[in-house]
Amino acid sequence: MAHAGRTGYDNREIVMKYIHYKLSQRGYEWDAGDVGAAPPGAAPAPGIFSSQPGHTPHPAASRDPVARTSPLQTPAAPGAAAGPALSPVPPVVHLTLRQAGDDFSRRYRRDFAEMSSQLHLTPFTARGRFATVVEELFRDGVNWGRIVAFFEFGGVMCVESVNREMSPLVDNIALWMTEYLNRHLHTWIQDNGGWDAFVELYGPSMRPLFDFSWLSLKTLLSLALVGACITLGAYLGHK
């Protein structure tokens, strides 16, 4: 596989296609809009929802009152001018990430089922829940397993948003995921061989990806999603 060099691939495209895949698994179709390359720091373009028979998600965010009143819209990073052209994402990267996400979901099927039932999303709580989980997920460092968990958690939030007839939140979640990748994970990914290295390590052989303790993550998810009134630090300090 040709390596993308230091510039890397377009994180926005990776996020958009992953979310599209997770929603399609539940029978939803999401037009991710313009997935052309965007440099780290740039915000993704909003997507547009359509639905397969039997599902009635909201129309595009610009036409929905939830989107108009939501405080969650985040502008592009200041100074996010056009940077070096990013390389197109090879299909094998998307495929490997999907396979890893599905494997993660299967391993923790019960936890994700409980999480979905407890995910009390509103336009005013979604970003806080996302930020709390992601901050704790990477508190002790970054590895590929945690990056996959990051994508899968974002996918769960998107599916639950549509299930609760708040589909405009999907555009926001995609934006938050892309921004976090660009600002906090992009350097680690590039320093560790980029997405090509992820494919080489976990693609055909599917080397075990989830070889660290998930207790703190699962505890965190439970706390964040039921809106516990204690801080994570205080809780984890007594464990």
Curated annotation (Swiss-Prot):
The modification Phosphothreonine is found at T69. The chain crosses the membrane at residues 212-233. Phosphorylation/dephosphorylation on Ser-70 regulates anti-apoptotic activity. Growth factor-stimulated phosphorylation on Ser-70 by PKC is required for the anti-apoptosis activity and occurs during the G2/M phase of the cell cycle. In the absence of growth factors, BCL2 appears to be phosphorylated by other protein kinases such as ERKs and stress-activated kinases. Phosphorylated by MAPK8/JNK1 at Thr-69, Ser-70 and Ser-87, which stimulates starvation-induced autophagy. Dephosphorylated by protein phosphatase 2A (PP2A). Proteolytically cleaved by caspases during apoptosis. The cleaved protein, lacking the BH4 motif, has pro-apoptotic activity, causes the release of cytochrome c into the cytosol promoting further caspase activity. Residues 75-85 have a biased composition (Low complexity). One of its GO terms (biological process) is response to UV-B. SUPFAM superfamilies: Bcl-2 inhibitors of programmed cell death. The record marks D34, V35 as: Cleavage. SMART domains: BCL, BH4. It is a single-pass membrane protein. The keyword Transcription regulation does not apply. InterPro entries: Apop_reg_Bcl2, Bcl-2-like_sf, Bcl-2_BH1-3, Bcl-2_fam, Bcl2-like, Bcl2/BclX, Bcl2_BH1_motif_CS, Bcl2_BH2_motif_CS. A motif (BH2) lies at residues 187-202. It is found in: Mitochondrion outer membrane; Nucleus membrane; Endoplasmic reticulum membrane; Cytoplasm. A motif (BH4) lies at residues 10-30. One of its GO terms (molecular function) is molecular adaptor activity. Gene3D superfamilies: Blc2-like. Keywords: Apoptosis, Autophagy, Chromosomal rearrangement, Cytoplasm, Disease variant, Endoplasmic reticulum, Membrane, Mitochondrion, Mitochondrion outer membrane, Nucleus, Phosphoprotein, Proto-oncogene, Transmembrane, Transmembrane helix, Ubl conjugation. BH1 and BH2 domains are required for the interaction with BAX and for anti-apoptotic activity. The BH4 motif is required for anti-apoptotic activity and for interaction with RAF1 and EGLN3. Forms homodimers, and heterodimers with BAX, BAD, BAK and Bcl-X(L). Heterodimerization with BAX requires intact BH1 and BH2 motifs, and is necessary for anti-apoptotic activity. Part of a complex composed of SEPTIN4 isoform ARTS, XIAP and BCL2, within the complex interacts (via BH3 domain) with SEPTIN4 isoform ARTS and XIAP, SEPTIN4 isoform ARTS acts as a scaffold protein and stabilizes the complex. Component of the complex, at least composed of LRPPRC, BECN1 and BCL2; the interactions prevent BECN1 from forming an autophagy-inducing complex with PIK3C3. Interacts with EI24. (Microbial infection) Interacts with Toxoplasma gondii ROP17; the interaction probably promotes BCL2 phosphorylation and degradation. It is linked to A chromosomal aberration involving BCL2 has been found in chronic lymphatic leukemia. Translocation t(14;18)(q32;q21) with immunoglobulin gene regions. BCL2 mutations found in non-Hodgkin lymphomas carrying the chromosomal translocation could be attributed to the Ig somatic hypermutation mechanism resulting in nucleotide transitions. Belongs to the Bcl-2 family. This is Apoptosis regulator Bcl-2.
